[in-house]
Design a protein with these regions (language model features):
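Membrane-embedded and interfacial regions of multi-pass energy-transducing membrane proteins
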Residues: 2-221
């Protein structure tokens, strides 16, 4: 009887292959790799904008672009480098390292982990699509000061993109907290956790506290 049962184990249902593996993966290492590749792509995009900024500043006077386009490049460079390169890189490292450092088999909420990543490309597609709208990309600098932040319909798309990024960050933070608090190896106390895990536990709580405030602030622009 046991031989019959063994023969009916799901031999033909291995892991998905190709693009489907990356679209639907719930493995923390795969999702961490997706975060790191996305971060690298955004780093190249933001770096190209930085090169445009430096080329414009190479000599006094107008070289390559008018002041409006320059402000737009500065704004998008800042948004992409912070929200698209730095933060996803940290989250990618967290996905890779936290389960291994606390002895967990995976993140506690793997499907939420997958969704929190795929929200990010959606947000940046919306953000970069403002380049093709009336008035071009947001051009209010890193401070979001009015009246630069009150013109053109692209500001609404920027606000929507920031909301999506905030939802992604909150979902990722909840996942980190639940994983650390509930999936540590037997016998591992909080005081025995590595410093990297502690830093991410505190960061996750801070992100949950801060992201709604940021969302409210940009909504009131």
């Amino acid at each position: 009887m046991s031989a019959v049962i063994e023969n009916h184990e799901h031999d033909h249902h291995g892991p998905q292959k190709g693009i489907l593996r990356w679209l639907f993966t719930t493995n923390h290492k795969d999702i961490g790799t997706l975060y790191l590749w996305f971060s690298f792509l955004m780093f190249l995009t933001g770096g190209a904008m930085a090169m445009g900024i430096r080329a414009e500043l190479f000599e006094p006077g107008l070289q390559l672009m008018d002041p409006i386009r320059y402000n737009q490049l500065v704004t998008m460079h800042g948004l992409i480098m912070i929200f698209g390169a730095v933060m996803p890189a940290f989250v990618g490292l967290a996905n890779w390292l936290i389960p291994m450092q606390i002895g967990a088999p995976d993140m506690a909420l793997p499907r939420m982990n997958n969704l929190s990543f795929w929200l990010l490309p959606s947000a940046f597609i919306i953000l970069l699509s403002t380049a093709f709208m009336e008035g071009g990309m947001p051009g209010f600098g890193w401070t979001f000061y009015a009246p630069l932040s009150t013109n053109y319909p692209n500001i609404a798309y920027f606000v929507f993109a920031v909301h999506i990024m905030g939802v992604s960050s909150i979902m990722g933070s909840i996942n980190v907290i639940v994983t650390i608090m509930n999936m540590r190896a037997p016998g591992m106390t909080l005081m025995q956790m590595p410093l990297f895990v502690w830093s991410w536990l505190i960061t996750a709580y801070l992100l949950i506290a801060v992201m709604p405030v940021l969302a409210g602030a940009v909504t009131m622009l």
